[in-house]
Swiss-Prot record:
Keyword match Signal: no
Enzyme nomenclature, EC number: 2.1.1.33
Binding site for substrate: 124, 156, 196-199
Interaction with RNA: annotated segments: 126-131
Organism: Lactobacillus gasseri (strain ATCC 33323 / DSM 20243 / BCRC 14619 / CIP 102991 / JCM 1131 / KCTC 3163 / NCIMB 11718 / NCTC 13722 / AM63)
Matching CDD domains: AdoMet_MTases
Function: Catalyzes the formation of N(7)-methylguanine at position 46 (m7G46) in tRNA.
Lineage: Bacteria, Bacillati, Bacillota, Bacilli, Lactobacillales
Name of the protein: tRNA (guanine-N(7)-)-methyltransferase
GO cellular component, one term: tRNA methyltransferase complex
Residue numbers binding S-adenosyl-L-methionine: 46, 71, 98, 120
Amino acid sequence: MRLRNKPWAQKLVVEHPEAILNEPDPEKKINWEERFDDFSKPLAIEIGSGKGQFITTLAKKHPEMNFIGVELQTTAAGMILRTKLEEKIDNLQLMCADAANIAMYLPENSVDVVYLNFSDPWPKTRHEKRRLTYKSFLDKYRQILKPEGHLEFKTDNQGLFEYSLVSLNNYGMKFDYVSLDLHHAENEILERNVETEYEHKFAAKGNPIYCLHAHFE
């Protein structure tokens, strides 16, 4: 869902290059060691962070890790940035960037977890290549993930979930966890689950939340 443009968000993004990379050049290497206090910590990245409830909550809960939130919309990125600055979340960096270039922004084998939360389902067949679980995106995740790293995916869209199961399976990924109704599962996955804004809204309406965890072999 595209948010209404908020001029203050664009201004905030421009004023804080130390906290957010705004449309970075994919051809230029990013010095992540300078952007984090300790880049040797485990690294998690969320692609499509929205207003940032998930990534900011997770970063505050896990100071022993580093986090990167990637969001294409400037207004949404500005909202996350405002939270980061107000709450002094030092282990979180942001990117206002196209996820199609993610493998050019991060070193190979540097990421422990890739989070995909409530991604745009792009339901029309002609838009299949835009889905974040399409094979070309899986190629990129494989490049940046460590050998022991994994992907975590949540959605309320049954069609996208079914498509993603097939896409990951055809790619040769192995599933560590699959749920057709995450919020009614009784396990440690639910216990450590952090909700997104959309997830809270959809679950409150009684909609099932689909979830999978998978890794590359």
